[in-house]
Amino acid sequence: MTDTDALISIRKVKKAFGSFQAIEEVSMDIGRGEFFSLLGPSGCGKTTLLRMLAGFENTTEGEIFIDGHAMSDVPPHHRPVNMVFQSYAIFPHLNVRDNIAYGLRKRNLSRAERYEMVDEMLDLIKLPGYGTRRANELSGGQRQRIALARALILRPKVLLLDEPLGALDKQLREQMQLELRALQRQVGITFVFVTHDQEEALTLSDRIAVMSGGRVLQVDTPERLYERPVSRAVAAFIGNMNFFRGTVRRNGSASGLVETEGLGNIPLPLDRLTRPDGAPVQVALRPEKFTLSRTRPEGALAVAGRLSNAAYLGERSHYYVSIDGCATPVAVSSPNLGVGRGLAPPTPEDGPLWLSWSPDAVVLLDAD
Amino acid sequence: MADTTLAGKADSEADPPRRSGRLAGFLHRSETARGYLLISPTLAIMTVGIIMPFLILLVLSFWTRQGFGFDTTPTFNNYIRVWTEPIFGALLQRSFWISGIATVATVLLCYPMAYFVAFHVHRNKMLWIILMTLPFWTSYLLRIFAWKVILGYEGVINSGFMAMGWIQAPLEFLLYSQTAVIITLAHAWAAFAILPLYVSLEKIDKSLLEAATDLGDGPVARFLRVTLPLSMPGVIAACFLIFIPTTGDYVTPALLGGPDGAMIGNFIQLQFGAVNNWPMGATLSIVLMLWIAAIALVFLFLTRRAQARIT
């Protein structure tokens, strides 16, 4: 991402509430038309950052640029951004149409023009004919859509969404995720989306910033965040991960490997080692990257272990396999392909099980 | 989990639930009956203490005075007198004028106070509210006399202004005038305005205000389009709570009003006292009640209209 593409540039922004440092120092760029998520546990500063973009909080230090303009001195009602609030903040004294048309007041439009725009928005959010409904007659999902329409009708440069799906039940949330993504593609507006739900962030986003304790840990595409996390915190926050202690061994400039506690020696191409000989590392492997078998697989990296626990989850099962040299059992996730296909579900009585994996799936992280 | 449900089932088979009595059963089934039971003490007091006297008043208003007793033949004579003789209309008009001004002044003065506590005080809100009601812990009569001291011919304001050299002679319009009555009423009823205003402002979800700002409203537009309409129930409640009792007030005008400040309440009191024309007093009370009801309805209608207009 080059600077000219960036619609939002956050430059060395810090935020303190009294003695509490909510944002340590954050710099990042958000591109035009991107669906960008701020992901992190509660209290990580993601909502504070969003509210600074909206202008509801000042930056203590640093500067935010939107479309090239510094935002420090721009009050929230003059910023080219609009927000969908976590509580939706639908005006209870107005009907649906007046809620959606609320921000159009300053645009010098006739009543007919305003109503036409509202009707277009109602079609877009799939609630045609709802204009005269009162706010208290709406369900959670409908309120959410109206909050969205009320912001989108103003054609902001950036739409900020503060956990907008958090209050919905699971099914509705999944449906709204798909609709939100489709809507974003349709209108082409940059979305900045705050969530603590990693699955939601992975489903929706072009790029995700993983935050923790007021810092940005990694900004990347969902796939790279999952496959190539840069730190243990990111690896542990997104999905499940097995960690093994290891040491880098370089054999001159020809080849290299990682000695691990539990998984034995894993040969890796030199360009992936990126660390000097003897450096301590952590080796991380996702549960679904392991293959289980009852006999030692030919030509693959493998270790033997014993099944200590199993959980059946329908489409897949989780197994916990104890191996020598590793205090905690290794988590393995394996699809249930059905009777006669793949491995029949193992039981603890089966005797030794073999775990195999590909070196490509291995992630090297700094030792902690 | 399964164990406990099984155990529960076994218990209930051994010992079937006790059946309640017929009255209790009836009350259990009917929510309306339970509701009436709950309000029955209040209902009894209302009937004995308000509806009965009101009916007596109503009957009395159709009688006429005869010497020291009543002529009990029903007649509209009193109502016709109230309608035709200008003194009654003038007094009613003055009463509504004085208490109307007092109401508007009270609500306008109390709204910022309630707003401040609701939006800008973050700790010890209740303490602030209690402090605001502190003056009302002393007797009404004492407060009226306090205003007498402040507004009097040689009172705090006049002597203060004279000492400053701002005025040569004491301001005479301060005491024993409509101004005095309005000032005192506005002060006396402030607590009744602050509390409903505070409650309605406090209830407003702060994210609605942020949403309005986010959608392009500056502070003034936001106040007019969100805060004020959403606090309207409090404003209406405050207006009613002040306007209705102050129109009939007779203590304040009697003590501070002077000749120009007498209100309908003083006149009604006279009818039941010195003039000894109870039927006329009853008629005036009924007429006052009808007028207040009419004004309240018009007021409600206008605020509804205004609210629809603003939004």
Model-derived features with residue positions:
Chain B
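Short membrane-interfacial helix/loop motifs at transmembrane-helix boundaries
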Residues: I50-P86, I150, E154-G155, G257-P259, ...
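Membrane-interfacial helix termini and adjacent extracytoplasmic/periplasmic loops
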Residues: A24-H28, F76, I144-A186, V220, ...
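Transmembrane alpha-helices
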Residues: P41-A44, V48-I51, I130, L134, ...
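C-terminal transmembrane helix and the adjacent membrane-cytosol boundary/short C-terminal tail
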Residues: D3-D11, R18-G21, F26, Y198-L209, ...
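Non-cytoplasmic
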Residues: P53, L57-L60, L142-I144, W189, ...
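Transmembrane alpha-helix signature in integral membrane proteins
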Residues: P86-F119
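N-terminal signal-anchor/first transmembrane alpha helix
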Residues: A2-L6, S12-I56, M126, I130, ...
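Interhelical loop and adjacent transmembrane-helix boundary motif
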Residues: R29-R34, Q66, Y79-F88, Y250-L300
